[in-house]
UniProtKB/Swiss-Prot annotation:
ATP binds at residues 107-109, 185, 218-220, 224. This is Non-structural protein 2. The keyword Metal-binding applies. Its main location: host cell. Participates in replication and packaging of the viral genome. Plays a crucial role, together with NSP5, in the formation of virus factories (viroplasms), which are large inclusions in the host cytoplasm where replication intermediates are assembled and viral RNA replication takes place. Displays ssRNA binding, NTPase, RNA triphosphatase (RTPase) and ATP-independent helix-unwinding activities. The unwinding activity may prepare and organize plus-strand RNAs for packaging and replication by removing interfering secondary structures.
Length: 312
C-alpha cells in the first residue's frame, strides 16, 4: 500500500484538476533532500526534475536500508503514467477537489496486476478504455464500485461458473512490491441476485477443491481465498483498519454479500470487531465455528459423486 501522492501530482486550472506523473529522478532527489518538518506534508519541488512526492511519504520507497516501492523499476514509470492518464479522463472539477484525495491509500499490487491485464492483447482491458478507467479507480479506492469479474485485478482464471470466477493472484514476479503469497480472488460476474442453491454449490466446490484455504472478505463484495494459517494476520489487518477509521472519524463499511461460502469463523470474528469487541476476544471465533450443515452435505455429495464415477 502507498498513497496516491507517491505516484502523481496535480495542478488546479480554472475549470478542472490536471494530473501529472511523478518521475523516478524526482523521487530519488526527494529521498536525499533535507526538508523542514513543517514542509514535509507538501509536494517537494526538486528544481531539476519537477515535483516529487511529499517527504512525509519517503518511507514508502525502497532504499538500501528498507523494503518499499521500487521507484527505479519500469513498472513504476508505467504505473504513474497510467494513473495520471486515468485521473485526467475522469475530469474532476476544480471546485470539488480536496487535497486529502492525494493521501488516499491505493492498492499497489492490485495496480501492477492491472498493468499486466492492460498489456494482454486478448484481455478486454487492453481495448476498453471506459472499463480500464473504472478498474483503476477501484484499485485506487476512489470509487464505491463493486469489483466484478471484468474489473478484477488478475486474468489467471482457475474456475468459472454462471455467477462466480476464481482467479489466481501471483505477486511473486512483481517489481514494485513483490510478495510471496498463495492466494486467489473470488468475484461475481455481474451484479445480480445469486440463488442460495448456487451459493451452496460454490461453497461446497471451494471446500472440496481448496480445502487448505478459507474464503474471507474485507467488506467490499469481492473475496479472497487465503491459507487457514493466514486467517489471523488478515483479521489483525482488518482490525487495524476498523480502529483507524474510528480514530479519524470515518465510518467503516463492511459488506461481504452474506454469501454462503464466506468462512463462518471469519464472518463471526469480523462481525464482533465491527460491534466493538476487542480483537483478543473476537479472534477466538476464527477457528471455532464449522461450516453450515447444508454446505457440509453438499461437499460430501461432491466426494460421493466422484467416488461413484471412479467406480464406474
Amino acid at each position: 500500500m502507498a498513497e496516491l501522492a507517491c505516484f502523481v501530482s496535480f495542478s488546479l486550472t480554472e475549470d478542472k484538476v490536471v494530473w501529472y506523473p511523478i518521475n523516478k529522478k524526482a523521487v530519488q532527489t526527494m529521498l536525499c533532500a533535507k526538508v523542514e518538518k513543517d514542509q514535509r506534508s507538501n509536494y517537494y519541488d526538486t528544481i531539476l526534475y519537477g515535483v516529487a512526492p511529499p517527504p512525509e511519504f519517503r518511507n514508502r520507497f525502497k532504499t538500501n536500508e528498507r523494503y518499499g516501492l521500487d521507484y527505479e523499476s519500469d513498472q513504476y514509470t508505467e504505473l504513474v503514467n497510467l494513473l495520471a492518464d486515468t485521473l485526467n479522463m475522469v475530469s474532476m472539477p476544480t471546485e470539488k477537489f480536496q487535497f486529502d484525495i492525494v493521501k488516499t491509500v491505493v492498492q499497489v499490487r492490485h495496480l501492477e496486476n492491472l498493468l499486466c491485464r492492460i498489456k494482454d492483447v486478448n484481455d478486454i482491458l487492453n481495448a476498453n478504455v471506459k472499463l480500464r478507467v473504472k478498474a483503476v479507480m477501484i484499485a485506487c479506492n476512489l470509487v464505491n464500485e463493486t469489483e466484478t469479474t471484468p474489473l478484477t485485478e488478475s486474468n489467471d482464471i482457475v474456475y468459472q461458473d454462471s455467477y462466480f470466477t476464481i482467479t489466481k493472484l501471483d505477486y511473486s514476479n512483481h517489481k514494485l512490491l513483490p510478495l510471496m503469497a498463495d492466494e486467489y480472488k473470488i468475484t461475481i460476474n455481474t451484479k445480480t441476485d445469486i440463488p442460495d442453491r448456487n451459493q451452496t454449490a460454490f461453497a461446497a466446490y471451494i471446500r472440496y477443491n481448496f480445502n487448505k484455504f478459507a474464503a474471507i472478505s474485507h467488506g467490499k463484495r469481492h473475496w479472497r481465498l487465503v491459507l487457514h494459517s493466514q486467517l489471523m494476520s488478515h483479521a489483525e489487518r482488518l482490525d487495524r483498519k476498523i480502529k483507524s477509521d474510528k480514530k479519524h472519524g470515518r465510518q467503516f463499511s463492511y459488506d461481504d454479500g452474506d454469501m454462503a461460502f464466506v468462512h463462518p469463523g471469519w464472518k463471526t470474528c469480523i462481525g464482533q470487531l465491527c460491534g466493538g469487541t476487542t480483537f483478543e476476544v473476537a479472534k477466538t471465533s476464527l477457528y471455532s465455528i464449522k461450516p453450515s450443515k447444508t454446505v457440509r452435505t453438499a461437499t460430501n455429495k461432491i466426494e460421493s459423486d466422484l467416488i461413484s464415477m471412479v467406480g464406474n
